């Protein structure tokens, strides 16, 4: 999972993620927006979940982050899982609205994002 942090002309941090993980970048850009307290909450939840069967989720305005002891899922809130009813052409839409990754990989991005934000 590759990522890049940039600052736009106004100084706002933007995250770009590799293909298949774009939604994670959107979560940082739309939900985190340099709010390090939210990252603290996510890291605390990850520590609590490690080695357990429990899960945790944080619904935001545009995206929801869901996590268990092994995996992180970020999905667009407007994405409805219709199961077998999903049309064949909807896979591309689904990839633009849902990303999965391991907890450790996600926490590495969180730590790198925090470091980048603090380098003002």
From Swiss-Prot:
Protein name: UPF0231 protein YacL
Record-linked InterPro entries: UPF0231
Gene that produces this protein: yacL
Similarity section: Belongs to the UPF0231 family.
